[in-house]
């Protein structure tokens, strides 16, 4: 562990600039997983749960999604949404209970809807999820196996939260993983 006054971005920049560092690679059949790019987390002018993404994040995500479609690769959009009762949120929603609480992102609500700045296509796959990782209790693993995917490119909102959880689960399942820094918050 390094103890310093450097920011995480500074440490990351130093790591990327390390001479002789082995280049990370993707496999032969990637899928794109876009995590929680929904209004509850992308519209700070509307929702206190939202945050600002990287400059140009949506244009980068849209360009990447278009490129993946041209390759006939799966383009997946996950979003958080819960039952009207909020019971399916479990411990994840037990921290607090107010209008902005996690369990109050309801299916079909404006908070659950994908941000309108995203360019989706009819061939894209939408996954509702209830926990941080897109893999948790969804059929994502089956879909990736069926489509023959060996790697995933992950974009999204909270890099330290749901993006990270999805990345850890993907790597734990043996996928090569890439997180484009231009495509995350």
Regions found by a protein language model. Give the residues of each.
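Glycine-centered short loops/turns at secondary-structure junctions
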Residues: 70-73, 148, 174
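Internal catalytic-core helix/loop-beta-alpha segment
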Residues: 107-156
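A short glycine-rich beta-strand->turn/loop micro-motif centered on a GG-aromatic cluster
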Residues: 153-156, 174-185
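Short glycine/serine/threonine-rich phosphate/pyrophosphate-binding segments
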Residues: 159-166
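Short conserved active-site loop signatures built around small residues
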Residues: 170
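Active-site acidic carboxylates
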Residues: 1-120
């Amino acid at each position: 562990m390094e103890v310093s006054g450097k920011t995480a971005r500074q440490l990351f920049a130093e790591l990327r600039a390390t001479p002789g560092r082995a280049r990370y690679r993707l496999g032969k059949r990637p899928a794109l997983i876009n995590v929680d790019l929904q209004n509850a987390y992308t519209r700070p002018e509307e929702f206190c749960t939202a945050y600002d993404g990287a400059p140009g994040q949506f244009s980068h995500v849209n360009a990447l999604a278009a490129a993946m479609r041209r390759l006939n690769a799966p383009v997946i959009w996950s979003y958080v949404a819960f039952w009207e009762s909020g019971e399916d949120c479990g411990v994840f929603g037990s921290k607090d209970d107010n209008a902005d609480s996690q369990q109050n992102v309801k299916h079909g609500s404006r908070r659950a809807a994908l941000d309108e700045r995203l360019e989706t296509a009819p061939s894209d796959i939408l996954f509702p999820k209830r926990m941080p990782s897109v893999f948790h209790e969804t059929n994502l693993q089956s879909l990736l196996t069926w489509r023959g995917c060996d790697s995933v490119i992950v974009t999204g909102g909270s890099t330290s939260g749901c993006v990270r959880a999805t990345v850890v689960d993907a790597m734990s399942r043996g996928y090569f993983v890439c997180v484009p820094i231009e495509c995350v918050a």
